[in-house]
């Protein structure tokens, strides 16, 4: 695919892997990321083979027919790259190697998932719907030999499934369980971060309860599997109507508090340190001229669409592209003077004076071409002096998932807990993991230098787990 798009070897795989390790503070396993980076393309090709009706686009917003969009398309993200963006010159790069399935379906990529499921069923796979895993089974040698499930749609009867080769856990994350979150990611609970899993925003199960409850984590831990330390909450901020585009940010005291040109996860971290976990994004009437100089990162605007461009293309919409007119109402506050704007935001007294002084200082730095206060790239420093002025209030973001499962490796193995009697940390025979219950992929923070990386590792290691389980690797 990347060869088709002219992106073959555009990023060295070790550059990507090393960046991912840094963003996770080296508490994850490089071997997992390296194997994925070297071979993910092979599994992606296999994955889409199941759906021959897929239309592969050459650019992010290539014109397609409604029929093509209804059946499903695959697009390269941020391609072609913005004229003024080169990831190699960025402190926080977003690598141009991501792609996205799109369709008229609510679940977007559901068509290719269903195609692979149907292929498995045709090959003899048996499915059990509405069932909950409750317990893993082991033999006297410690090998996992099966699982007990509860069939919620048939009188809650329990069924024992015996495994000739092994058991693969693909049970998702644990963000919907507050007890697990308090232990492994307490800052999410302490900061009262909105939890999409616990709130049922990611769907509910057949009993009407929220999902992402850590069932696989529990089942593994109950038989002695080591749970990964330092879970990684996926709390990357997506901003407001203007996304996370790096315009000026002030806290409630009127102070500028960061280099705004950082990714959404780092933005969230900084906002959580501010009074009331609140900030204001400010920009002026010339924002449309400034957007093309902004980074092509996750959640930010960096392309301006001509006003006369036809919008009938089903593949027209993309988060990084906008017409200026499309953002005419994408603000919370608007005024012809900065003082009036800040007053609307709630600033008064000393905080108002501080905010005005902060903007004056920012304007001086922008004109001088050097951010001596926070080190923001000069090419993204734009003085606020063109009315009308706009502002959006930000709070904390929502957590999509909390990534951190059973400790694993590049072969999807699981390992025993630390034990002075067995310091070598034995592999648990017959138990494999993939998806968000596979630990050691990320740690501390979810990295966003490559968009969609969670899905990519889920697909890749789902394939590896299946192959290795059958082969007894």
Residue ranges and their predicted role:
Residues 27-32, 50-64, 226-230, 258-259, ...:
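A short alpha-helix-loop-beta-strand transition element characteristic
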Residues 154-157, 162-237, 449-451, 455-464, ...:
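Glycine-rich loop(s) and the adjacent beta-strand/alpha-helix scaffold that form part
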Residues 159, 297, 307-311, 404-473:
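C-terminal structured subdomain/cap of oxidoreductase catalytic cores
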